[in-house]
Amino acid sequence: MNIAVVGLSHKTAPVEVREKLSIQEAKLEEALTHLRGYPHIEEVAIISTCNRLEIYAVVSDTEKGVVEITQFLSETGHLPLNYLRRYLFTLLHQDAVRHLLRVAAGLESLVLGEGQILAQVKTTHKLGQKYKGIGRLLDRLFKQAITAGKRVRSETNIGTGAVSISSAAVELAQTKAEDLANRRISIIGAGKMARLLVQHLLSKGATDITIVNRSHHRAQELAAQFPQASLNLQLLPEMMQVVASSHIVFTSTAATEPILHRENLTAALDPNHALMLFDISVPRNVASDVHGMEGIESYNVDDLKAVVAQNYESRRQMAQEAEGLLEEEVEAFDLWWRSLETVPTISCLRTKVETIREQELEKALSRLGTEFAEKHQEVIEALTRGIVNKILHEPMVQLRAQQDIEARKRCLESLKMLFDLEIEEQFG
């Protein structure tokens, strides 16, 4: 078995491609079941965020497993394979392991060191278990990645003052609008991103903020976290009325189709009304046909890169410190993974030795006579089992502890030959 990751991110694909491959949580079980149905995929987990879609898999055949994942992505996004491949990356074995640890640590994020991705990795692990996508290998890998992410944040300063997608969007809005305190601002959506938007808008002096959401209860929960802000709450049917009266609109919903487009904006807006749209959703909430509309400035997540770049240089040194910690975690996982190669051989050897012990014990007890056997069987049983365990213990400990891959393979081959073991290979 080997580990592979196939995916795309803000580094390899623009938002118009990423949004086609975004997998919402409601569709995750179906996607995992579909992937597990391929003949060469044994375990699978999916990280889907606004900046990345990555599929981690344990594959019985590396090349065929990667082809199956690529085929799945092509079908999911309704994208031709030749077109899709130019945006995909594929990492195998230790490179795949290292990549996930870097993702969890925030080193692969658009916003270097941002903390939200660690929560998303935890969610991927939890849902992968719930929907039976994750097995022994990916369970251990994701736990190692979560440990790595926590270590990087606790043992380095990379997370201190890190901007997020939401804070970068607010920063960009302030740059474009100059004074947020005198602007009517609306946020469409009431999830985690919306909460962060409110938090950063308030810190920049915004005072007139309206939340528009499908669920009034969800909007109330958000408003309750900022009692001092007196947030205005509106339901989705009033969305266009709110947009028409706003100077700045942020969109952060889980809608799979655009909710703002040329048609409804043209109908709702006064011809002389100036509006700024900041769309931090993937799939996009603002349609591409909005670009070029008179009086409207529209920005999406890919437009945040300039804001993030200002923050990047000061964080690069901290990222280098984090790399050393990640290598320790990569090595820890690699040692565990490689030790699994010994499991079939050790198990087979123990089974064979135990069979011999039981056979020889039965012969000895029959020669000793029924009365003696019944009286002393437990003692003799414990004696023989103790001898076997003592003989096998030290070689097995040394075998598991052997870090040199080639040396371990030679030891395994020697055991197979010397004891004539017939083993079905489980890990390659």
From Swiss-Prot:
* Pathway as given in its UniProt record: Porphyrin-containing compound metabolism; protoporphyrin-IX biosynthesis; 5-aminolevulinate from L-glutamyl-tRNA(Glu): step 1/2; Porphyrin-containing compound metabolism; chlorophyll biosynthesis
Task: Summarize the subunit comment.
Answer: Homodimer.
What function does this protein fulfil? Answer: Catalyzes the NADPH-dependent reduction of glutamyl-tRNA(Glu) to glutamate 1-semialdehyde (GSA).
- State a single Pfam family of this protein: Shikimate_DH
Task: Please state the Enzyme Commission number of this protein.
Answer: 1.2.1.70
Q: Does the keyword NADP apply?
A: yes
Q: Name one GO biological process term.
A: protoporphyrinogen IX biosynthetic process
Kindly provide the name given to this protein in its UniProt entry. Answer: Glutamyl-tRNA reductase
Mention any additional remark: During catalysis, the active site Cys acts as a nucleophile attacking the alpha-carbonyl group of tRNA-bound glutamate with the formation of a thioester intermediate between enzyme and glutamate, and the concomitant release of tRNA(Glu). The thioester intermediate is finally reduced by direct hydride transfer from NADPH, to form the product GSA.
Q: What class of enzyme is it?
A: oxidoreductase
Q: Does the keyword Oxidoreductase apply?
A: yes
Name the source's superkingdom: Bacteria
What is the species listed in this Swiss-Prot or TrEMBL entry?
A: Rippkaea orientalis (strain PCC 8801 / RF-1)
Q: Where does substrate bind?
A: 49-52, 109, 114-116, 120
Q: Which residues bind NADP(+)?
A: 189-194
Which Gene Ontology molecular-function terms are recorded?
A: glutamyl-tRNA reductase activity; NADP binding
Catalysis: reaction(s): (S)-4-amino-5-oxopentanoate + tRNA(Glu) + NADP(+) = L-glutamyl-tRNA(Glu) + NADPH + H(+)
The record's listing under Gene3D superfamilies reads: Glutamyl-tRNA reductase, N-terminal domain, NAD(P)-binding Rossmann-like Domain
Q: Where is this site: Important for activity?
A: 99
Instruction: Identify the HAMAP family for this entry.
Output: Glu_tRNA_reductase
Quote the gene name from the UniProt entry.
hemA
Query: Domain description from the entry?
Result: Possesses an unusual extended V-shaped dimeric structure with each monomer consisting of three distinct domains arranged along a curved 'spinal' alpha-helix. The N-terminal catalytic domain specifically recognizes the glutamate moiety of the substrate. The second domain is the NADPH-binding domain, and the third C-terminal domain is responsible for dimerization.
Q: Which PANTHER family match?
A: GLUTAMYL-TRNA REDUCTASE 1, CHLOROPLASTIC
Matching entries from CDD domains are given as:
NAD_bind_Glutamyl_tRNA_reduct
